[in-house]
Amino acid sequence: MTRINSGFFFCAGEWKRPEIRVDVYEVTGKWRDEVWRPFAKHHYLDHNLNRTARQFVGVYDGQVVAHTGVIQFPMRTGWKRIHRLVVLPDYQGVGIGVRFINAVAALVASEGYNVNLTTTTPALVGALKHSEDWALVRKGVVKMGDLKDRPYASAKRLGAADSSMRPTFSFNYRP
């Protein structure tokens, strides 16, 4: 379990963040599909979760408020990728997402892996750019023509979601 501080309150003439405890759990077994279901509709690319993903949830006050998966980074030995990060809308904007993925990334890094996250979400990009825990390693727009010779191009032809024509930002976790 990992403690996460977030949120705001006004005290003595300045804004301060109250402590919000969010516990992080790895989800295993039969609960995998059930846990992802309420988050699926809030993900900007599609509603699918990689079947091989390790799943983690953030729980605040008895409510599951955040979800992410961790998958093998394609074609890169020793690397894992944060996959399908979602914070429920009522809990967005107070720092839960970044602290949640920091806790998950720290766990994965402690297992000997490098960790990557690629996103197009402006708020997450801004937060990670200002974080000492993440290094921006790539930014740009992926064009469909760039994908045609790659092994996963067939997945796109079958209707898989992608970030083509969106500004994307890729970050590496630095423990």
Where are these regions (language model features)?
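A conserved beta-strand-loop-helix scaffold within acyl/acetyltransferase catalytic domains
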Residues: Y25-Y91
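Conserved GNAT acetyl-CoA-binding A-motif
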Residues: A106-A123
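Conserved catalytic-core motifs of GNAT/GCN5-like acyltransferases
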Residues: W134-R157
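A short acidic (Asp/Glu
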Residues: G126-H130
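Conserved N-terminal entry element of GNAT/NAT acetyltransferase domains
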Residues: M1-G29
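Conserved acetyl-CoA-binding loop-helix of GNAT-fold acetyltransferases
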Residues: V87, Q92-A106
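A conserved mid-domain beta-alpha-beta active-site/ligand-binding segment of alpha/beta enzyme cores
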Residues: A155-P175
